[in-house]
Amino acid sequence: MEFYPIAIEKLIEEFAKLPGIGKKTAQRLTLYVLNLPREEVEEFANALIKARGTIKYCSVCGNFTDKDPCAICSNPNRDKNTICVVEHPKDIMTMEKVREYNGMYHVLHGTISPMAGRGPNDIKLKELISRINGEIKEVIVATNPNVEGEATAMYISKILKPLGAKVTRIAHGIPVGGDLEYADEVTLAKALEGRKEI
């Protein structure tokens, strides 16, 4: 039994395709949008269409941008000697919020994952290698601390070290405010590995 007209069912289906949106949330979003004034719905739809039509990947780092190169790559105040390697453009946004890093970025657009059928040629590693020249002093690998992220980090280290680049990995460990008793063995081991002198 259908509760809604086909157009509403279709909109619910489309919202449910978004990450983290289940059928109930998609239904709430649909009903919310349908109750908005027509002008606001048109503004929302136009913003989606415009973003999809104008946003592209930076030819240097692979970040989202509306001009090429992106604002980070074209900023003369950024440290051009350091590249932070991340999995996705959203990771750049996360790193930038911290305001501790002032270098360049490189987006892999994925990780090495044999289980998912992704090898080194399926992510932006060739582009990373081509960026390593005499100017690059350090490559910081900031992939996620999971099996795929670790495998990708190890592979990057293996291919870049012969090129003379210093390859480092961001530290992983106990979150601020976390209790040791709730930390798993792998997290605690990583925290010990990444310890610093105080």
Curated annotation (Swiss-Prot):
SMART domains according to UniProt: TOPRIM
Gene3D superfamilies assigned to the protein according to its UniProt record, in alphabetical order: 3.30.60.80, 3.40.1360.10, 6.10.250.240, RecR Domain 1
Pfam families attached to this UniProt entry: RecR_C, RecR_HhH, RecR_ZnF, Toprim_4
Keywords: DNA damage, DNA recombination, DNA repair, Metal-binding, Zinc, Zinc-finger
Gene Ontology terms: biological process: DNA recombination; DNA repair
Alphabetized GO MF terms: DNA binding; zinc ion binding
TM annotation in the entry: none
CDD domains referenced in this protein's UniProt entry, alphabetically: TOPRIM_recR (cd01025)
Residue stretches making up the Toprim domain: 81-175
UniProt entry tagged with the keyword Metal-binding: yes
Top-level taxon of the source organism: Bacteria
C4-type zinc finger span: 58-73
Family that this chain belongs to: Belongs to the RecR family.
Protein task: May play a role in DNA repair. It seems to be involved in an RecBC-independent recombinational process of DNA repair. It may act with RecF and RecO.
Protein name: Recombination protein RecR
Organism: Clostridium tetani (strain Massachusetts / E88)
Upper classification of the organism: Bacteria, Bacillati, Bacillota, Clostridia, Eubacteriales
